Every structure is written in C-alpha cells, then in structure tokens.
C-alpha cells in the first residue's frame, strides 16, 4: 500500500496486489519478519487493486520529512516522533501479516492486520469517508476528493482475493510505504 495524499483530515493510498516473488523478506532489529518491495516499479496499473482511506498521517516513526509535509499541529515534525491521537491516526509504515477473523464490532469476517505497534484491532473494512474509520483502513475507489465509493463491493473482492491466496498457502501481508 502506497500513501499518495497525506491531508489534514485523511490519508489516501493505493493498494496493490503483489506475489511473494515481488517482495524481499528479512528480519528487523527487533527480530520481526519484514517485507520490502524489490522493485518500486511493481506498483503500477497491472498490480493496482483499489484505493484506501485512513485517518490523518502523523510521523509516528520520526522519519525525516520533506518541507511540504511538515505541520506541527498534525504531528508532522521532521526527524521527531509524533504522538498517536487515538482513533484519528493512520497506522505507521511497515509490514503486517493479515488474517481474516470474525469482527465482534462489525459481526462479519474481515481482514485484520496483526502486530501493528501501538494499535490493536486494525481492520480493513468498507466506508466512504474519514469519519467512518477509527484507525482502520477503508477500501474503495477514490472518485470524490477525500472520499471512497464502491467500498462494499471492493471489500468483498479483497476478501475473496485474500482467501484465495491463503488457500494456496501464500503469505498475506500489507506493506505500507
């Protein structure tokens, strides 16, 4: 997943479907498995799946930022870790395994990102605007500025794709860049 618009009230991204052969598998300094993209050119029209919508992006990892992204009121200071605002913060960049589990809140089977530092219960679900998420990733088509359309149909298609990959023994991860 590549974030393409980090706005004041929301974050828009693009979700791509790649195979294990497109990813470099390694271990980080905490001993956790991580996946990085072998070739950024793989994020293209052929691998594009859908758009995503999340809450406001904050610099939770404390990375160096280009001047146009710096905004202290939004927790966007260069080389300084931001504070998480519960329910209003996009998850940090990284690689997270995905499982499909029954959501008590939504009362249906939904993708769940596992091991997101500082977050719990991060789901991928349907919704149309930033107000529809409390930190989760919404999927759909970004045809209206700051919003998604076709969210339910996109979610159904994504769950089918994840289950098919799992049934074939493939690892299912979301890597956010």
Where are the model-predicted features located?
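Low-complexity intrinsically disordered segments
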Residues: 173-177
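Cell wall/extracellular polymer interaction/catalysis modules
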Residues: 1-172
């Amino acid at each position: 997943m590549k974030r393409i618009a980090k706005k004041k009230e929301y974050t828009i991204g693009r979700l791509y479907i790649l195979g294990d052969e497109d990813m470099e598998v390694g271990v980080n300094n905490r001993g956790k498995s991580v996946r990085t993209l072998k070739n950024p050119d793989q994020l293209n029209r052929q691998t594009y799946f859908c758009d995503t919508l999340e809450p406001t992006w904050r610099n939770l990892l404390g990375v160096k930022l280009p001047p146009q992204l710096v905004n202290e009121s939004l927790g966007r200071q260069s080389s300084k870790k931001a504070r998480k605002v519960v329910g209003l913060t996009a998850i940090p960049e990284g690689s997270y395994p995905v499982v499909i589990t029954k959501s008590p809140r939504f009362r249906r089977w939904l993708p769940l990102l596992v091991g997101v530092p500082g977050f719990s219960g991060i789901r991928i679900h349907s919704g149309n605007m930033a107000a529809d998420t409390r930190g989760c990733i919404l999927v759909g088509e970004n045809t209206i500025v700051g919003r998604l359309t076709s969210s339910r149909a996109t979610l159904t298609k994504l769950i089918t794709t994840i289950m098919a990959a799992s049934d074939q023994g493939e690892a299912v991860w979301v890597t956010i860049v």
